[in-house]
Amino acid sequence: MMADKTSPMITSDHSISNFSTGLFGPHPTVPPDVGVVTSSQSQMKDLFGLFCMVTLNLIALLANTGVMVAIARAPHLKKFAFVCHLCAVDVLCAILLMPLGIISSSPFFGTVVFTILECQVYIFLNVFLIWLSILTITAISVERYFYIVHPMRYEVKMTINLVIGVMLLIWFKSLLLALVTLFGWPPYGHQSSIAASHCSLHASHSRLRGVFAVLFCVICFLAPVVVIFSVYSAVYKVARSAALQQVPAVPTWADASPAKDRSDSINSQTTIITTRTLPQRLSPERAFSGGKAALTLAFIVGQFLVCWLPFFIFHLQMSLTGSMKSPGDLEEAVNWLAYSSFAVNPSFYGLLNRQIRDELVKFRRCCVTQPVEIGPSSLEGSFQENFLQFIQRTSSSSETHPSFANSNPRNMENQAHKIPGQIPEEQA
């Protein structure tokens, strides 16, 4: 188990100065002053870093648990099975992976050593849970693609058996790749223990470290990025096309032309009604113009890239170059930037959804003595919210009225204000 550096360390043929571990390439020897704070400034920096890591860990645990509870206790939210699965994976990351990352990254734990088994478990959890989370995000994007671009096919084929099958496939593929870190090659030489700060993804004695590095980056990052970008681009095109097909705001009687032929009225399939009786709909110019839809998708895809791109580039570069010196601060930064994905995922895939938020408010109202009122959904909400409701398969009832082109003029006649001199329409 983990031990303090002051206690005797178990080694076979090498001293602690020869420790070199990981998956991809050689690592510098353990410096004699590991974990020693040299100044008050560095101590404050280390303390701030520890605070940020612990905060991210707590946010990941609480936020993902909250979204899971909201989905589990509401039958109408069962359609978010993949979102619930993502939150469950991120909870595992918050419980198993992130605490080990704190021990490995923080100088306050610089005197801690791992046994070889413990270090292997840490490396295994890194590959397994990271791949599991990324695969689930990819599955969510593909599900949204089929729901919006191919809705009929989605309704027929998206069954509970298919959802369970996809989840089992995700777990199997993640486990298969992670097992390579345990049985693929002996990455630790003849060592029997290792400093926790040197238990890293990018170090290995094996000549296959470069092959695994490329495989890890292509399968776990490059392929998911291509899939996510492609499907959300298709979703954007469909959303843009649907918005442009919506009829803009109907002019009032005062704005209408006073002279109209009877033939125009007969051929028209739309009854002239005032905007006061017309349901308030967001026009395409207000909802999708100016690149706002692209900006929303940029937030979703950009969050994934910001969290994971530096992580994979760093470890790929370190493994291919075989660098003997690892910049510790940079490695900690890219690792925890990647781990921050576990804390922000529930916001991007759960809390931005109005139905899940409302369910969380209801749950809070049940837990506290003072009731919390849920305000009505606003039709004039932010574009990001409206677009996310579209791609996340939710919308308020007031946002789902049929368009004019599909409405029967006879059915709307009783709801329209009678306009003086209006010529009644005849059915085609």
UniProtKB/Swiss-Prot annotation:
Major location (coarse): membrane
Region entry Disordered, spans: 398-428
One annotated GO biological process: G protein-coupled receptor signaling pathway
Comp. bias (Polar residues): 398-414
Keywords from the named record: Cell membrane, G-protein coupled receptor, Glycoprotein, Membrane, Receptor, Transducer, Transmembrane, Transmembrane helix
InterPro entries found in the cross-reference section: GPCR_Rhodpsn, GPCR_Rhodpsn_7TM
Membrane side Extracellular: residue ranges: 1-46, 115-120, 184-210, 315-428
SUPFAM superfamilies linked: Family A G protein-coupled receptor-like
Positions in the Cytoplasmic compartment: 68-93, 142-162, 232-293
Membrane topology according to the record: Multi-pass membrane protein
Glycosylated residues (UniProt): 18
Annotated Gene Ontology cellular component terms: endosome; plasma membrane; receptor complex
Compartments where located: Cell membrane
Keyword Membrane annotated: yes
Transmembrane segments: 47-67, 94-114, 121-141, 163-183, 211-231, 294-314
GO MF, one example: G protein-coupled receptor activity
Gene3D superfamilies (UniProt xref): Rhodopsin 7-helix transmembrane proteins
PANTHER family given in the database record: G PROTEIN-COUPLED RECEPTOR, G-PROTEIN COUPLED RECEPTOR 62
Family assignment from sequence similarity: Belongs to the G-protein coupled receptor 1 family.
Protein name: Probable G-protein coupled receptor
Originating organism: Oryzias latipes
